[in-house]
Amino acid sequence: MNTILVTGGAGFIGSNFIHYVMEQDPALKVINLDLLTYAGSLENLKELPDPERHHFVQGDICDGELVGRLLRKHKIDTIVNFAAESHVDRSIAGPLPFVQTNVMGTATLLNEARLYWLEEHRWSAKEIRFHHISTDEVFGALAPGDPAWTEETPYAPNSPYAASK
C-alpha cells in the first residue's frame, strides 16, 4: 500500500484532494498533517471513502522532528503540501505567520524529505515526489485584455501572502 503525506489536509482544497485521491486509489493510505488553524476543520474530512486509510495528525509543518518521524514511520514517498497561511488581509496586518508557515514550513518539509529520501533511504528521483501547491496570486493582478499567465510569467506578488507562496 502506498502512503502519502498531505499537509493542510483539513482545509478546503486539501480535504477535497484527500477525498479525490482516496476514491481514485483504493490502495492509497493518507497521512494528513494539519495544524487546524482558522482555515482547517475536521468537518471537511467527514464521509471519506475508507476512513481506515486516513490518519489525521494535528501538528505544525515547521516541526522538523514531527515531519521526519512521520516520513520514517509511514515510509512516505510522496508529499503534497497544501499547508499555508492564506488570508490576504491577515498577511497585510501581520506578515510574520505567513513567512513562518509558507516559507519556513515548506523549507522544513523539503529538508526532512531530503534527509529521509536522499541521505537515509537513498531512493532515486523516480521514486519520490514533492508537490507544492501555490496560488495564482504570485503573478499579481491580471487586467482585462492582458495575456494569460504562463510558466514563463514573472512573479509580481501584491501581498505578503502572495510573496510567501
Predicted regions mapped to residue ranges:
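N-terminal Rossmann-like NAD(P)+-binding domain of SDR-like oxidoreductases, especially those catalyzing
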Residues: 1-165
